[in-house]
Amino acid sequence: ILDDYNRESLSINISYSFPSEKVIEIVEQVIEWRGKPESIRTDNGTEFIAHAFTNFCIREKIEHIKIQKGKPTQNSYIERFNRSYREDVLDAYIFEDLNQVRKATEIFMDDYNNEHPHESLGDKSPIEFLNAVNCGKLTAQSTHTSLPQLTAIH
């Protein structure tokens, strides 16, 4: 899960399958940690179009924005993130088991969130940007105008 506001990677689930129930569990964990988003943008994967996920969004009053089929540019933040993750983790190593993938993913997320500058964030990392906004050194509007929103990894 990627936060559109500051491009922070909030969760990456490493598993052989990703049913809607697991998606809901992960989103609930993120909500408990960071608060409820106004919306969640996803592709049209089966885990996101399932009744369970749709009902969860309705129950939680979270707008579920589904990108149009064949239009990955409507989900550009996550597409770019997935590319970085694929290049830096999945394509960079040969893993023997999922635990090794999880460990490499933890290291990647820490680096991405704390060290990786984003042009759209004034060349700050996601955490640097969030800290600057929270300390009053920046206003969110001075850098971008996105509404708080989560983008789900597909």
Question: Which residues fall in each region the model found?
Answer:
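Short, acidic, Ser/Thr-enriched surface-loop or helix-capping motifs
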Residues: 3-4
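Short catalytic-loop micro-motif centered on adjacent basic/acidic residues
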Residues: 12-13, 39-43
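Hydrophobic "anchor" residues
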Residues: 8-9
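Active-site beta-loop-alpha junctions of metal-dependent nucleic acid enzymes
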Residues: 12-34
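A structural signal for short coil/turn segments at secondary-structure junctions
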Residues: 34-35, 116
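Alpha-helical structural signal in soluble globular domains
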Residues: 29-30, 52, 56-60
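C-terminal domain-tail junction helix/linker
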Residues: 60-62, 87-154
